[in-house]
Swiss-Prot record:
NCBIfam families: prfC, PRK00741.1, small_GTP. InterPro entries: EF-G-like_DII, EFG_III/V, G_TR_CS, P-loop_NTPase, PrfC, RF3_C, RF3_dom_3_sf, RF3_GTP-bd. CDD domains: RF3, RF3_II, RF3_III. The keyword tRNA processing does not apply. One of its GO terms (cellular component) is cytosol. Pfam families: EF-G_D2 (PF22042), GTP_EFTU (PF00009), RF3_C (PF16658). Increases the formation of ribosomal termination complexes and stimulates activities of RF-1 and RF-2. It binds guanine nucleotides and has strong preference for UGA stop codons. It may interact directly with the ribosome. The stimulation of RF-1 and RF-2 is significantly reduced by GTP and GDP, but not by GMP. GTP binds at residues 18-25, 95-99, 149-152. The gene is prfC. The keyword Metal-binding does not apply. Gene3D superfamilies: P-loop containing nucleotide triphosphate hydrolases (3.40.50.300), Peptide chain release factor 3, domain III (3.30.70.3280). This is Peptide chain release factor 3.
Length: 533
């Protein structure tokens, strides 16, 4: 039992959230490099990249230079803890799509982490997608560390950036490092907690030239010249005006420790990784419909937060990503697949290093394992050692965009249905079958998802589909007795469809129509999100 407790205590499972182009993929790569997980930190240059980021492995992502799916990477990281002892953590990094059109997959990934790193571009400050994602983290009070990136460019003043984060995101900022200049005059950072100056050298190993002790060190004046005195004055102001770090407020999602750096130059990344391991919580307890599951419980439990089809076109497979919530997983274990009511032996679970798959011998609470399946596992499914649990809080969102799928070759209708069913179960799109026709209607939270689906249908299923616009403003899941739902179908069946799970959905042609229908059928609930159970 003690080894179980100590293994779980050294896990850190987190995601990186940011607006597109804030430098998230670069930071991901550099964290993997500092963690020794990759040998070369390959730079990602949007569409021109010939060496692609480790975490962007799907063909379409390589073409577009954006992260379309969330991938999972695990690596060990050795460091010196605050009390000077050597410590090794196991870091599980979940990379999330930064593109605004992939918020649903990102949202679900955020249900599987215990903390998050928010990347802010020092030039652009807080942007739209950052606000959305932080609000998602807020629903579960996820602790957030902030990395203000691109200090090697002329950006906004650090004080202004902190004010904006506090004002727009409504979260206290506690600066842990402070930049010395910016752009061409960027010389490094001062560590407010341990009174050290870390000097920046873009050509140095890991971005650092030297580390000096103390603000009053005469060596500082020699190296920085007039910037040294400016720094002393600034730090005095910062200490007086900003919040000091409060661990309890951080763990409750009310305060964020802030680090400054330049990911592309490797600078500030190691401090962030050290802080992530030192400050972030180990695996946390999880709610189920019947009780709270503690990570140290000896029996295994886990839930599926993502399904990825065809991670390798050579294997026509699907991988269910399972967050381990308690206990220990061992290869060959027999687990209850709760929704199917069946016991299954898990012989070939895998861990991830983006594209590289390794067969898992064991995993602990906090880890992510991949379970290969042929269509029997769905989002939100739970695996246990026998207890019929249901974890809560993995939602599906009402789509905002709709398309009808049409085939160029009508003989491929079976492949189309199979492809769309698989992609819907994976969460890449939502599929609706209207009761009044044989149409297949797709719903998505962002337009780009249709491009992804069309590309994957063509390349993975050999189906050339055309997506036509579909008269629909929004979708609502129907909740009520079968008799009440039948009453609605009798009156407005042409607007009712079944989703991929076989649940009834109202596809409203306009918001006015939705409002009128709700008034006519007050006994029915029209739900905007549906928890996946």
């Amino acid at each position: 039992m003690s080894s179980l407790v100590s293994e779980i205590a050294r896990r850190r499972t987190f995601a990186i959230i940011s607006h597109p182009d804030a430098g998230k993929t670069t930071l991901t790569e550099k964290l993997l490099w500092f963690g020794g997980a990759i040998q070369v930190a390959g730079e990602v240059r949007a569409r021109k990249a010939d060496r692609h980021a480790t975490s962007d492995w799907m063909e379409l992502e390589k073409q577009r230079g954006i992260s379309v799916t969330s991938s999972v990477m695990q690596f060990p990281y050795s460091r010196e803890s605050a009390d000077g002892k050597a410590q090794e953590n196991i870091v599980n990094l979940l990379d999330t799509p930064g593109h605004e059109d992939f918020s649903e997959d990102t949202y679900r990934t955020l249900t599987a982490v215990d903390s998050a790193v928010m990347v802010i571009d020092s030039v652009n400050g807080v942007e739209a997608q950052t606000i959305k994602l932080l609000n998602v983290c807020r629903l579960r009070d996820t602790p957030i560390l902030t990395f203000i990136n691109k200090l090697d460019r002329e950006g906004r003043s650090p004080i202004e950036l902190l004010d904006e984060i506090e004002d727009v995101l409504q979260i206290q900022c506690a600066p842990m490092t402070w930049p010395i200049g910016m752009g061409k005059a960027f010389r490094g950072v001062y560590h407010l907690i341990d009174d050290k100056v870390q000097l920046f050298d873009p050509h140095g190993d890991k971005g650092t030239a030297a580390i000096l002790d103390g603000l009053d060190n005469p060596e500082l004046d020699r190296i920085l010249g007039s910037q040294a005195e400016e720094l002393r004055i600034e730090i005095e102001l910062v200490r007086g005006a900003s919040h000091t770090f409060d661990k309890a407020a951080f763990l409750n999602g009310k305060q964020t420790p802030v680090y400054f750096g330049s990911a592309i130059n490797n600078f500030g990344v190691q401090s962030l990784l050290d802080a992530l391991c030192e400050l972030s919580p180990p695996p946390l307890a999880r709610n189920t419909e019947s009780r709270v599951v503690e990570p140290q419980e000896p029996k295994f439990t886990g839930f599926v937060f993502k399904i990825q089809a065809n991670m390798d076109p050579r294997h026509r497979d699907r991988i269910a990503f399972v967050r381990v919530c308690s206990g220990r997983f061992e290869r060959g274990m027999k687990l209850l697949h709760v929704s199917a009511g069946k016991t299954v032996a898990i012989n070939n679970a895998i861990t991830f290093m983006a594209q590289d798959r390794n067969t898992t011998e064991e995993a602990y609470a906090g880890d992510i394992i991949g379970v290969p399946n042929h269509g029997t596992i769905r989002l939100g499914d739970v695996f246990t050692e026998g207890e019929p649990l249901k974890f809560t809080g993995i939602p599906s969102f009402a789509p905002e965009f709709f398309r009808r799928a049409r085939l160029n070759n009508p003989l491929k209708v079976k492949q189309l249905q199979k492809g769309l069913q698989q992609l819907a179960e994976e969460g890449a799109t939502q599929m609706f079958r209207p009761l009044a026709s044989n149409d297949l209607v797709l719903g998505a939270v962002g337009i780009l998802q249709f491009d992804v689906v069309a590309h994957r249908l063509e390349h993975e299923y050999g189906v050339d589909a055309i997506f036509e616009s579909h008269e629909c403003a929004t979708a609502r899941w129907l909740k009520g007795t079968p008799a009440e739902i039948e009453k609605l179908i009798a009156k407005a069946g042409h607007n009712v469809a079944l989703d991929g799970a076989g649940d009834h959905v109202y596809l409203a042609p306009s918001m006015v129509n939705l409002r009128l229908t709700q008034e006519r059928f007050p006994e029915l609930q029209f739900l905007e999100t549906r928890e996946i159970v």
